[in-house]
Regions:
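Terminal alpha-helical segments
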Residues: 1-129
Length: 129
């Protein structure tokens, strides 16, 4: 199955942008961009399967939607999604919740987003066969 290219391009741009921000030390934006990239990848897969995408930023909900469509996301992806989801809001509103954005957290968020992207690409390739 072919993932919608404009969704994948935007997600890949965000991942590349996050890598640059990681090197610049702008850790809060890395976490936000990682969450957004993961969200775009998950929605791209749902869109490819159904022709529609959900209106949510909750990555766990998106994984549950994929499970309901017959795919089986591995358990660790749920943990990654749960860790990434709050950064959609927390990274954009300083002082809302006490989060210390540092390199370690930013690297984890980027790794989690890459793992979600990898899984989405694998699933799209499997469905194509």
């Amino acid at each position: 199955m072919r993932l919608p290219p404009e969704w994948v391009e935007r997600a890949e741009f965000l991942l590349r942008d996050a890598e640059g921000h990681l090197e610049e030390g702008v850790y809060w934006i890395v976490c936000f961009e990682a969450q957004q990239a993961a969200e775009l990848y998950l929605k791209a897969l749902i869109l490819a399967l159904t022709g529609l995408h959900p209106y949510t930023h909750d990555l766990v909900e998106l994984l549950e939607s994929l499970r309901d469509l017959g795919l089986e996301p591995p358990e660790e992806l749920y943990a990654y999604a749960d860790a990434l989801t709050p950064h959609y809001t927390m990274s954009r509103y300083p002082g809302r919740k006490p989060v210390v954005y540092n390199r370690g957290l930013a690297e984890r968020c980027l790794r989690y987003a890459r793992e979600i992207a990898r899984w989405v690409k694998e699933k799209a390739a499997e469905v194509q066969r």
